[in-house]
Design a protein with these regions (language model features):
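Terminal low-complexity tails and localization/encapsulation signals of metabolic enzymes
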Residues: 1-46, 50-53, 57-73, 83-84, ...
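Rossmann-like NAD(P) dinucleotide-binding subdomain of oxidoreductase/dehydrogenase enzymes
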Residues: 86, 90-93, 112-248
Length: 248
């Protein structure tokens, strides 16, 4: 059991294998997460913009070493991540295990690919600034880790806003990075509701880039509110599939 203590509004997480609410008296919450307010969100964005730890000025070699440590932490904590995904999201061990492997691959891949890009002397590589990562509920390990790792590898400060259904799992992922030495000011975990706080976050003028996976309608709303932001959106689609006589 893990708890983030605060006077703020809390979101409780119960064992998904148990009957739905109302639960029997005395059934404990698996996690209790304090939710960020609109004021908290604004403060987080300011910290990300100010970059007090000077993450943007670190070298790729320094970032690569720290990210390698984060990947190692994720390897060591595979069981904890699988357990949290089951306890909070109801994901089976069979589903979570390969997702963790994919997350580790992401962390290892991005700094390595940047090293290859650095070999092109005609390119000038520089961070974009503040990156907001908003992943979905159904792949709560691999997709957020990929966005966070890519942004950090490039020297950006990151605001990581997990799905409301996976806040505790997002915290466990963030710990893998923090415990490797990546500053909490460079990677901030923002757990907020989908109302005014998240609108403030995604619409904030100091957020330079948004990495979003979710509904097409939501992505279009983000683009409408912040047309000047760099938006990398992976959304749902209704692509046609054509089966010809050549298929088995």
């Amino acid at each position: 059991k893990s708890e983030i203590k605060s006077k703020r509004k809390k979101q409780l997480f119960f064992d998904p294998s148990q009957p739905k609410m109302p639960l029997a008296p005395g059934v404990p919450a698996v996690y209790s997460v304090a939710l960020a307010t609109k004021t908290d969100v604004k403060k987080a964005v300011k910290i990300a913009k100010d970059d007090p730890e000077q993450w943007r000025h670190t070298t790729l070699s320094e970032r690569h070493e720290l990210l390698s440590g984060a990947a190692l932490n994720m390897r060591k904590r595979r069981g904890d991540l699988i357990g949290t995904a089951a306890a909070v999201c109801g994901k089976t061990f069979y589903e979570s295990d390969p997702e963790i492997s994919e997350a580790i691959d992401f962390i290892e891949y991005y700094p390595h690919s940047l090293r290859l890009m650095e070999q092109h002397t005609s390119l000038k590589l520089s961070p974009l600034g503040v990156v907001l990562v908003i992943p979905p509920w159904n792949f709560p390990i691999a997709i957020p880790t990929g966005g966070v790792a890519a942004a950090l590898a490039c020297g950006n400060t990151v605001l990581f806003k997990p799905s409301p259904l996976a806040f505790p799992l997002g915290a466990e992922i963030a710990k893998c990075f923090w415990d490797a030495g990546i500053p909490r000011e460079a990677l901030q975990l923002v757990c907020c509701e989908d109302g005014e706080p998240i609108q403030t976050l995604s619409g904030h003028p100091d957020v330079d880039t948004i990495i979003f996976t979710g509904g097409t309608h939501t992505a279009l709303k983000m683009l409408e509110k912040r047309p000047d932001a760099e938006l990398s959106a992976e959304t749902g689609g209704k692509n046609a599939t054509i089966v010809t006589a050549m298929a088995d």
